[in-house]
Regions:
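A short, Lys/Arg-rich alpha-helix, primarily the initiator
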Residues: 1-9
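Short alpha-helical DNA-recognition segment
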Residues: 10-30
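DNA major-groove recognition helix of helix-turn-helix/homeodomain DNA-binding modules
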Residues: 40-55
Length: 351
């Protein structure tokens, strides 16, 4: 079937493909599955069809997994880019192959992506249900990174609902899975530490809140935004998919997803840096608070983030707490300058 499909894509007849190496009738038997080709013949066919022997020998299930991966990568990138309608359409395409070939792990990823969409739509109850369903399958398949990421999502949902003890349990489970399986992802560990610290703060366990806040701060590094680059990669991946070049489609969909994650991380890092600044303000460690607020300020200035005004206001509050009137006035001037640049949304937010 794959040989026939590639031949049709290249507008080749049986005779064109057969050449002087084999008869058109033998090619027809191979295409229909009535005859198994030798390795020599496979190499000949792969060469003439501009593909690889590995591709021709792949099972339909393996191909289906790759197709699912492509659609899931694109959907995840689109969710990060707030293109939820297109993301849903790509998840539906992935679901078709998952159900047809009974792909359990890919099915769990589809559930998780659905949960992400519900989170974006603020449908917390539905998101929670989809994440729980996905995690049952991730646990069954020992998919440790996915388990950790899902526990984090469940913890964040529980935080929104002010269930601090339950949230703490989810975050501590995530930490345990990470450590037990020696995951090598510093950003993920930093995220875990931050949320454990934040939850301890909400539970008024200040000693542990400080401990985990310091652990989190050691893990975060700034990432450069590459929004235009990511969008061009997305178009490239789609182009390869339309051409039927699944190998390159998957390759570029992976790169696209990585870049969109970096973009998302940049926004996320600025949020965490700002919040760490607030936490250290509460701990009355003003020096550490300024370090994190200034990092958040730099990122938000570079990315033109509307939340810059929050960070500027926090810096102003720090100076007020230190009774540094001149510095507080200077910080207030920065806020007013930002508003005078025409940022009406910031003006409303500030007042």
């Amino acid at each position: 079937e794959k040989i026939k499909r590639k031949r049709k894509e290249l507008n080749m007849t049986l005779k064109d493909l057969a050449g002087s190496r084999i008869t058109p009738g033998q090619i027809s038997l191979v295409e229909s599955g009535k005859s198994n080709p030798s390795m020599d013949l496979l190499e000949y066919l792969a060469n003439d069809l501009n593909t690889t022997v590995e591709y021709l020998m792949e099972s339909e299930e393996t191909q289906a997994e790759k197709i699912c991966l492509f659609y899931q990568n694109i959907a995840e990138a689109q969710i990060l880019n707030s293109d939820l309608l297109q993301a849903e359409q790509n998840i539906d395409k992935s679901i078709y192959y998952c159900e047809k070939y009974k792909l359990e792990y890919q099915g769990a990823r589809n559930l998780s992506l659905r949960g992400d969409i519900y989170m974006e739509q603020q449908d917390i109850a539905s998101a929670q249900q989809f994440f729980l369903s996905a995690n049952i399958i991730f646990i069954k398949n020992n998919s440790y990174e996915e388990i950790i990421e899902t526990l984090l999502k469940l913890g964040k949902i529980t935080l929104k609902m002010m269930g601090y003890q339950s949230a703490s349990s989810y975050f501590k489970q995530a930490e345990k899975v990470f450590i037990d399986n020696q995951m090598g992802n510093d950003f993920l560990l930093g995220e875990i530490y931050y949320y454990i610290g934040y939850t301890y703060f909400k539970l008024e366990n200040i000693e542990n809140a400080i401990k985990y806040s310091y652990l989190a701060k050691e893990k975060f590094n700034q990432i450069n935004s590459k929004n235009e680059y990511a969008n061009s990669l997305l178009l490239l991946a789609d182009g390869y998919n339309k051409k039927g070049d699944i190998k390159n489609a998957i390759k570029y969909s992976k790169v696209t997803l990585k870049v969109f994650k970096e973009i998302n991380n940049l926004t996320y890092v600025s949020e965490i840096e700002n919040n760490l600044g607030r936490l250290f303000y509460e701990f009355e460690n003003m020096e550490e608070s300024f370090i994190h607020l200034n990092k958040a300020k730099e990122i938000r200035q570079n990315t033109k983030d509307l939340k810059l005004i929050d960070t500027l206001a926090n810096i102003c509050e720090n100076y007020i707490k230190l009774k540094s009137v001149s510095k507080a006035k200077e910080a207030l001037k920065h806020i007013l300058d930002y508003i005078e640049d025409g940022n009406n949304t910031a003006l409303c937010k500030y007042y």
